[in-house]
């Protein structure tokens, strides 16, 4: 598959899995939902913020990192980044795209209030934390000392709120 084909395939797989399939199963597991206006507003705000952060991260990765976000368990589905990204959304945490997805799912969970959907969300979080660990090993191999310095000063997933004061 050509670079452009791999790129498109990576985006398509990511969209289908993270924005369609997992939320579909969260809703399926939740069964009947009857949210009030407050929960609906909270869900919409969190979902929009999460998707916004993820999209910003993807666009930044394409433009600055010159790569594609889909590299699953050390298998290259889309072209890997050629440059280490340490600015933009990547200055607040090393995995802003994943943080955005977690925020999106948290919004859905507030809407659904389902322990079954919460278990799916928790399983997804555990799988993705394992993926992050594998990805960080690859980034250390690919970018060496530069990545280790970035890793030392930037949190993996949960932003240090004090870092916003510095920027």
What positions do the PLM features span?
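Membrane-anchoring alpha-helices and their flanking helix-loop junctions
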Residues: 1-87, 99-167
